[in-house]
Design a protein with these regions (language model features):
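Buried hydrophobic residues that stabilize the cores of well-folded domains
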Residues: 1-148
């Protein structure tokens, strides 16, 4: 069995700043660091491998109305290989999530639906790269329905 222990470090404002995961004999499996803006919004997550070398960086960009978040996923050479653009509804819940590759092609779109209590009721996943069009209607490749 694999035993992994993760140690979390927080600052004086209780924000997660760093996490380190260690394995069976206390050897590092990897770590992550977190950065925040002056509004306490997460703006950067950097992932390191077991040797302390940077593997991936995720940078967060927020619009002024907090209705949209962009996440840019960068490899160790700081090249963007994936982007996620998330639009939020009036209640602050994700409404549409677009997944975009490093060449700015939309690969996937996820549409979120909520019940009257604000709980996720359905998520429709669309493959935007390989269109499944029938009579000019985009068909979802996966529908997840949540029952409470």
């Amino acid at each position: 069995s694999v035993i992994v222990r993760t140690i979390y470090y927080h600052d004086e404002n209780n924000r997660l700043m760093k996490e380190i995961s260690v394995g069976k004999y206390g050897n590092s499996i990897g770590s992550k660091t977190y950065e925040y803006d002056i509004l306490d919004r997460k703006i950067k997550i950097t992932t390191y491998d077991n040797n302390g070398l940077m593997e991936e960086t995720i940078k967060f960009v927020y619009d002024n109305k907090n209705s949209k978040i962009y996440k840019n996923y960068m490899d160790s050479s700081q090249e963007i290989f994936l982007k996620k653009e998330t639009l939020f509804n009036g209640e602050g819940n994700p409404y549409i999530e677009a997944i975009i590759d490093g060449k700015d092609r939309v690969l996937e779109k996820n549409v979120f639906f909520y019940d009257t209590l604000g709980r996720t009721s359905q998520v429709k996943q669309y493959d935007m790269f390989r269109h499944n069009e029938f009579d000019n209607v985009q068909l979802p490749i996966k529908v997840s329905i949540y029952e409470y």
